[in-house]
Amino acid sequence: MEPFAFGRGAPALCILTAAARINLDNFVPCCWALFRLSFFFPLDPAYIRNENKETRTSWISIEFFFFVKHCLSQHTFFSKTLAPKRNFRAKKLKDIGDTRIDRADKDFLLVPEPSMFVNGNQSNFAKPAGQGILPIPKKSRIIKTDKPRPFLCPTCTRGFVRQEHLKRHQHSHTREKPYLCIFCGRCFARRDLVLRHQQKLHAALVGTGDPRRMTPAPNSTSSFASKRRHSVAADDPTDLHIIKIAGNKETILPTPKNLAGKTSEELKEAVVALAKSNNVELPVSAPVMNDKREKTPPSKAGSLGFREFKFSTKGVPVHSASSDAVIDRANTPSSMHKTKRHASFSASSAMTYMSSSNSPHHSITNFELVEDAPHQVGFSTPQMTAKQLMESVSELDLPPLTLDEPPQAIKFNLNLFNNDPSGQQQQQQQQQQNSTSSTIVNSNNGSTVATPGVYLLSSGPSLTDLLTMNSAHAGAGGYMSSHHSPFDLGCFSHDKPTVSEFNLPSSFPNTIPSNSTTASNSYSNLANQTYRQMSNEQPLMSLSPKNPPTTVSDSSSTINFNPGTNNLLEPSMEPNDKDSNIDPAAIDDKWLSEFINNSDPKSTFKINFNHFNDIGFIYSPPSSRSSIPNKSPPNHSATSLNHEKASLSPRLNLSLNGSTDLPSTPQNQLKEPSYSDPISHSSHKRRRDSVMMDYDLSNFFSSRQLDISKVLNGTEQNNSHVNDDVLTLSFPGETDSNATQKQLPVLTPSDLLSPFSVPSVSQVLFTNELRSMMLADNNIDSGAFPTTSQLNDYVTYYKEEFHPFFSFIHLPSIIPNMDSYPLLLSISMVGALYGFHSTHAKVLANAASTQIRKSLKVSEKNPETTELWVIQTLVLLTFYCIFNKNTAVIKGMHGQLTTIIRLLKASRLNLPLESLCQPPIESDHIMEYENSPHMFSKIREQYNAPNQMNKNYQYFVLAQSRIRTCHAVLLISNLFSSLVGADCCFHSVDLKCGVPCYKEELYQCRNSDEWSDLLCQYKITLDSKFSLIELSNGNEAYENCLRFLSTGDSFFYGNARVSLSTCLSLLISIHEKILIERNNARISNNNTNSNNIELDDIEWKMTSRQRIDTMLKYWENLYLKNGGILTPTENSMSTINANPAMRLIIPVYLFAKMRRCLDLAHVIEKIWLKDWSNMNKALEEVCYDMGSLREATEYALNMVDAWTSFFTYIKQGKRRIFNTPVFATTCMFTAVLVISEYMKCVEDWARGYNANNPNSALLDFSDRVLWLKAERILRRLQMNLIPKECDVLKSYTDFLRWQDKDALDLSALNEEQAQRAMDPNTDINETIQLIVAASLSSKCLYLGVQILGDAPIWPIILSFAHGLQSRAIYSVTKKRNTRI
């Protein structure tokens, strides 16, 4: 008779006396077998048939377990006395096993019994009539006392409501671990423990499987060491990464990465034996880390320009700074015996953290990393409790877990540890032909963390999909298995719309092209082969310039760029070219060469040095009389470097005597033509008007910059009285122009600076010696370059004004030296713009670009070795070039952005740092030495040792610098593409390195001591390499954030904590999605029709707009949950002003709302290219739908109102300067255009209304309300932006009144008068008269120029102001038909 049945788990320690037993009528908890139980039937059916039918009672025969021998004898005596008919049988302790007996006679409570319950294990019980009590164990009573628990554990008497709960509980007694993690082979007793283990250790792998990529071989069979398990079967189809093995009691089972199924200790012994058999010497571990507190030695000037960052990654490029320090490895004394590691929820085999290699030599040498693999992880707290997980699964009504169907056959590489050369060749062929691949990149040094093997796949949804399934899957109608993306990121796919939006992105290919390897570079090609398998791209077309211009003209200078100055590149790429993780070997190696050599080394760089030190945007129109040499073919001779150095020399018409071939006024540039052709005369007149506008706008902004400079420096400066021979600015208190550093007045007050900004520290980046070496390296005269004090001032401006918004460079880690001085030049270039020295910025940009071209020339053959500071310098140069007023430079940004993105992927900067180098924390967990107090305390001290914390700090800064650089590229590339409609995005699905850390202060720390103090303050413990990895990667993967935007994952929403910088990146990803959907709508429409904006807009509204709305709602919830603010109020202004990310997010968010209504890329592209006539035409075409225009105007007015709130708050703080971020300025400019266009539509209705015509349309009530709202917001803006005592600028106002004297009335309307005019009961003629007289369309454009003038920093604002002025002239001179 089997021992398990209801009621058989009663305490067996029989200590009651006979008298006590006799007094118990029906129920004695300690022994149910000896007495007549009127409410139970016997367990044995034989006794049911022979029961005494008169009394309806029976004798129950049950086997009891005893620990004490005399108790067994006593129980046997009573059994024979009271129940002579029963043959009681007892088992000895050795036959029982580990049985818990710790209950007494009060362990049960009688409660009403349900009408019937069924025990599906052994026997069925039926309740006799009239009886209704069941026992509830005391242990279960503390949970619920009003619910029967009929399923009792035979070992510990714990009761359960459901049988499956009892089965799950019994695994703790039987030591059964039926659930296997497919990645590492770890076995667990419960399925939720496997899920928690995979979320912690294999988070990058969970969900990466795609049924369309993984196609198991039909004839292959599994080889999971059959002797270790009874049966293997596929678990529930929702669990792609869990295998259930019935009856398994092993801790670890074989996997493709650990075919032997051994623990870390066993693997170490196998490695030693293998090394001895092959006569290979294993490396000796480093000595024990010193526990004493020691000062970090002074860092040497690294070749990369940063402070000490160096890790043991031989053969892998380190993308930050280097030093002589190498990560030490703790050496445990051999005499110390390590206890067997505990079975943790998230521990894994050491083999999981090693990358495979086909070479036997590397297979052996790589085993030295086994001792660094984790033995136990201390942060195994689940993201979802087991109860929550099981409740979520039970709500889905999933089918029961069975072992009926075996899993699909999988081919495993059995030659992983085979030293046979033939086996190795077979393995290489198998890897080349197999279409299944991992999405984690193997590094060259074989230290990739958690590299998976081949694992099972199912066509059904995963458990995460089922738990997050809801009614709207980002507007697509829920989960669709046929188009399911591994990361639910198909909606961010940048493929062409051949199928639905849930196509796989390019990062997850359907087929992998095979690549052959050679014996000479087998090891590097093996690493590249795995990397190559990540992308389904064919080799990209090489970039070739299309007639790169040799001369560039703008309003401040005439420049003939030298090689690499502006990086003008017109790439001839295929339309379906995708940006994915690209294997450097698979790319045409000419793309970087053509980017480097896109201009002539012999070309010259010209600038007007009469105004070299002038404040503001100096106006100098292009001259037809300028002598500019023609472009020469590239010269690769030995003298080419001399030409490169001479390209910046003032000897090429850059004399210091003030002579120039540029006119100083527009009247000298253009004269009336002598011919009488009316067409030519009209064209010349338009050209003259355009030059006049450039001249007026330049004077306006230069005057504004000069006024701001006076406020900042507290001195009177006049551009017309600058000593051109000295070519230095006169600062108060400065006696020596070559002084090392001059302290400027603080540009930004403390209340405006972010609390996350870099702490003020006297760090001098430029010295006289460094400046002299830079001048000699570039062959520049000292007078044609900013002074040392000016360069350091520009660095200060960069720290205070630009870095808080775009903190992708860790400033405290920079070491000034000649190796990385282009980065210093690019930093000072941005600071020069904030110091209103645009000419200095142009010189610095040219020098930095020239040196970057030389650096790229060195790594031309191996772009994967590109260093981090090179890419960061290119990013800063891209900021300068994109927001430049030079159209030729802007046209070349497509090629420059494309090159940066390819360099990112070639250098694997978009991948986690742990895939390239090992974290510096030792893997031996502290619990390994719990039985040795001495070693236990020693290991604890090592974790907090100064040397170890310094290594952790360096690793953290390096990882975060890489992550933030990628996010900066994502930000600028997608926003620029969204503005101009170009396809040069760094796609969100390719960003896999992580997110900015939640605590921004950790990244801004200047040294490891400050960093350690903050860790203690935030209670962050780094006791394993995985805790450091998690912290360095921002504690979240960006793919999970994108999945939330797509699915609204409630699990992510409830558990994730992301920074505001991550929210900004997610908002940019939504902009990317809008661009993709807009392009898809155009492509879908253009298949059958010509370009038609109205048809494209209809396609957009029918297929894409709902998805964008859903994503924006999800983003809003996440942003508000993490402390964000969307609507500025008087109480929230201080919070918004203290967080630079919020100041960027609010306008960018409202800009996304506008883009969902109107496709503004057509208009902004024309403005960037200064095509004013086509700009006016495109704006009318885009705003054809009054409903969409009305909705976009709502968001535009909210943006202007938010800016006014910011400005008012700063003004109340007695601050006269409010520097708007460049992205916010761009969004504000677009908002002003939209508001003006809507007001122009209303004014056109007013002018065209005919009261005598009964068919004339009336003004809608919504339009009345919106017009009144616009009038109120613009009046508030005017009152705060233009003080009453200040006169309006005559240059702009007079120019408009020259066109139409009634075009602009700057007097503010009375609020009561405006409300009365918009009242529907008011006479329509009064309403029309007020609308026409107010002329809000022209007033809005004028105030827009004033907004741009408040922060005249980036040169692009000249183009923006010119566009607003051109639109104003167009609006007052052209009579338009009514569109309402």
From Swiss-Prot:
GO terms assigned for molecular function: DNA-binding transcription factor activity, RNA polymerase II-specific; RNA polymerase II cis-regulatory region sequence-specific DNA binding; sequence-specific DNA binding; zinc ion binding
Q: Which GO terms describe its biological process?
A: DNA-templated transcription; regulation of DNA-templated transcription; regulation of transcription by RNA polymerase II
Q: Which GO terms describe its cellular component?
A: chromatin; cytoplasm; nucleus
Predominant location category: nucleus
- UniProt lists compositionally biased (Low complexity) regions at 424-445, 624-634
Q: Which Gene3D superfamilies match?
A: Classic Zinc Finger (3.30.160.60)
Per UniProt, the C2H2-type Zn-finger stretches lie at: 151-173, 179-202
Compartments reported by the entry:
Nucleus
PROSITE patterns per the UniProt record, alphabetical: ZINC_FINGER_C2H2_1 (PS00028), ZINC_FINGER_C2H2_2 (PS50157)
Q: What keywords are assigned to this protein?
A: DNA-binding, Metal-binding, Nucleus, Phosphoprotein, Repeat, Transcription, Transcription regulation, Zinc, Zinc-finger
The entry's family comment says: Belongs to the RSF2/TDA9 family.
Name of the molecule in the record: Respiration factor 2
